[in-house]
Swiss-Prot record:
GO biological process, one term: peptidoglycan biosynthetic process
Record's function text: Catalyzes the dephosphorylation of undecaprenyl diphosphate (UPP). Confers resistance to bacitracin.
Protein's name in the database: Undecaprenyl-diphosphatase
InterPro entries: UppP (IPR003824)
GO cellular component, one term: plasma membrane
Extra facts: Bacitracin is thought to be involved in the inhibition of peptidoglycan synthesis by sequestering undecaprenyl diphosphate, thereby reducing the pool of lipid carrier available.
Source organism (scientific name): Salmonella arizonae (strain ATCC BAA-731 / CDC346-86 / RSK2980)
Annotated EC: 3.6.1.27
Catalytic EC class: hydrolase
């Protein structure tokens, strides 16, 4: 593979990762399809995907740095809570409660989960995840009990964490599982999405570091330019995707995302079967 060709592949996959990582459409499904079409598969490809995920995580940190510092009691500039707003406050405890279920299951069944990374499982996960998005839109309370992040209860945070366990099924979509769970628990669509992004930082960071540690032997100095291009591309595109997504969900439901998931599932079937 020539240098220019590998850098082009890195840029394309970085765009795919950045666009899909935090949308409820399954980045795994997209990466499997695009990687296959580009002929970029195998151990190096898996390690590359782990590295560019760090770029997406960095985008969330940049977007929500004020809120993330606030979770540990460090506030910059204006306070997060204004007069007339909820007397509640999103805390680190909410994040920990949201992390525990999937973190425990992920650590215990890490190798088993990795064995599920194949097109047929991803295809089924895309469909089931789409059905969950539709169910969340149809069954959510008419008036959310938690309109904003600071209105969320510990119970809601923990239940969202339980829904996040569904994302251990490759192709399900972590954001799709957590946002759907939040809406079913009475959290507004926007607040559930914000919480999903905040929850992504420790969850994805932990999983990515673990994967990177186990994949370290597949890294070589010759891969650094390719990995760097993928990382930077994923970071920039993820920033744009997150901002656009948060504006978009103020105006539309998640039904279009569910339909899109069904289309991607069909694409997986066509490409691999």
């Amino acid at each position: 593979m020539s240098d220019m060709h590998s850098l082009l592949i890195a840029a394309i996959l970085g765009v795919v990762e950045g666009l899909t990582e935090f949308l409820p459409v399954s980045s795994t499904g997209h990466m499997i399809i695009v990687g296959h079409l580009l002929g970029f598969e195998g151990d190096t490809a898996k390690t590359f995907e782990v590295v560019i995920q760090l770029g997406s995580i960095l985008a969330v940190v940049v977007m929500f740095w004020r809120r993330l510092f606030g979770l540990i009691g460090i506030h910059f500039g204006r306070p997060l809570q204004r007069e007339g707003e909820s007397k509640g406050q999103l805390t680190l405890i909410h994040i920990l409660l949201g992390m525990i279920p999937a973190m425990v299951l992920g650590l215990v069944f890490h190798d088993t989960i990795k064995s599920l990374f194949n097109p047929i499982n991803v295809m089924y996960a895309l469909v089931v995840g789409g059905l969950l998005l539709i169910a969340a839109e149809c069954l959510k309370p008419k008036e959310p009990r938690a309109p904003g992040l600071d209105d969320m209860t510990y119970r809601q945070a923990f239940m969202i964490g339980c829904f996040q366990c569904l994302a251990l099924w490759p192709g399900f979509s972590r954001s799709g599982a957590t946002i759907s769970g939040g809406m079913l628990m009475g959290v507004s669509r926007y607040a559930a999405s914000e919480f999903s992004f905040l929850l992504a930082v420790p969850m994805m960071m932990g999983a990515t570091v673990l994967d990177l540690y186990k994949s370290w032997s597949f890294l070589s100095a010759a891969d650094i330019p390719m990995f760097a291009v993928g990382f930077v591309t994923a970071f920039v595109v993820a920033l744009i995707a997150i901002k656009t997504f948060l504006q978009l969900i103020k105006r539309i439901s998640f039904i279009p995302f569910a339909i899109y998931r069904f289309v991607v599932a069909a694409a997986v079937y066509v490409v691999f079967f």
